[in-house]
Amino acid sequence: MAKTPSKKAAKAPKKAGSKRNKRVETYSSYIYKVLKQVHPDTGISKRGMSIMNSFINDIFERLAGEASRLARYNKRSTLSSREIQTAVRLMLPGELAKHAVSEGTKAVTKFTSN
């Protein structure tokens, strides 16, 4: 009995201007780093990471929307750290807002000093 050629279709050669798959950017590496700082012996599942990523995207969109609204109310065309800080104070409850503002201020100070 003769061996028959495989039935897999040959891939078409790539065109010069063919589109590449767009990379999906996530916060997973940052979530993992924070998790290891807080609980070094704890892991996270793919589904848990996906939920955390969605959560961060949601909070980011809400804060950006609120900051944008604040800038529009004050007839500003540029978002500054002040609008972001006010949006954080409006969106997050009590202690969480205080911690977020202090961490944000610390990050901005570190960024501008380098």
UniProtKB/Swiss-Prot annotation:
PTM per Swiss-Prot/TrEMBL: Monoubiquitination of Lys-110 gives a specific tag for epigenetic transcriptional activation and is also prerequisite for histone H3 'Lys-4' and 'Lys-79' methylation.
Q: Which CDD domains match?
A: HFD_H2B
Recorded hits in Pfam families, A to Z, give:
Histone
Cite the location of the cross-link Glycyl lysine isopeptide (Lys-Gly) (interchain with G-Cter in ubiquitin) from the record: K110
Report whether Membrane shows up as a keyword of the record: no
Annotated disulfide bonds: none
A GO molecular function annotation here is:
protein heterodimerization activity
Q: Which domain of life is it from?
A: Eukaryota
The answer, when asked if Hydrolase is one of the entry's keywords, is: no
Q: InterPro entries given for it?
A: Histone-fold, Histone_H2A/H2B/H3, Histone_H2B, HISTONE_H2B_site
Subcellular location per UniProt equals:
Nucleus; Chromosome
Q: Where is this region: Disordered?
A: 1-22
The entry's function note states: Core component of nucleosome. Nucleosomes wrap and compact DNA into chromatin, limiting DNA accessibility to the cellular machineries which require DNA as a template. Histones thereby play a central role in transcription regulation, DNA repair, DNA replication and chromosomal stability. DNA accessibility is regulated via a complex set of post-translational modifications of histones, also called histone code, and nucleosome remodeling.
**What binding partners and quaternary form does the record give?**
The nucleosome is a histone octamer containing two molecules each of H2A, H2B, H3 and H4 assembled in one H3-H4 heterotetramer and two H2A-H2B heterodimers. The octamer wraps approximately 147 bp of DNA.
Q: What is this protein called?
A: Histone H2B
Provide the species name. Olisthodiscus luteus (Marine phytoflagellate)
